[in-house]
Amino acid sequence: MEQAPEDQGPQREPYNEWTLELLEELKREAVRHFPRPWLHSLGQYIYETYGDTWAGVEAIIRILQQLLFIHFRIGCQHSRIGIIQQRRARRNGASRS
C-alpha cells in the first residue's frame, strides 16, 4: 500500500524569495567578470522585453547563468572554478620540443 512520504524537514523558502536571492548572487558574480555598462545594457534589454515581471527575472537569471558558465569554461583568469589554464613557462627563451 502506498504511503505519503514522511516529513523531510522544513519547507524551502518561497519561490520568489529564493529567486531574488539567486538573482542578487548572480549579479554580484557577474559584476566581477563583465563590464558594468554591458551588464546595464543587458538589464535594459530584459526590462524592455519583459517589463517588471517574474518572466524578466527568470530570463535574466538564465542569461547570467549561461554567460558565467561559458566565461568560466573558456577559462577566466581569476576564476575560482572551471578550467585552470596552465601557462608554459619559458626560461631564457628555451622551449622543449
Curated annotation (Swiss-Prot):
GO terms for cellular component: host cell; host cell nucleus; host extracellular space; virion component. Pfam families: VPR. The keyword Transcription applies. Residues 1-42 are annotated as: Homooligomerization. Phosphorylated on several residues by host. These phosphorylations regulate VPR activity for the nuclear import of the HIV-1 pre-integration complex. It is found in: Virion; Host nucleus; Host extracellular space. HAMAP family: HIV_VPR (MF_04080). This is Protein Vpr. It comes from Human immunodeficiency virus type 1 group M subtype B (isolate ARV2/SF2) (HIV-1).
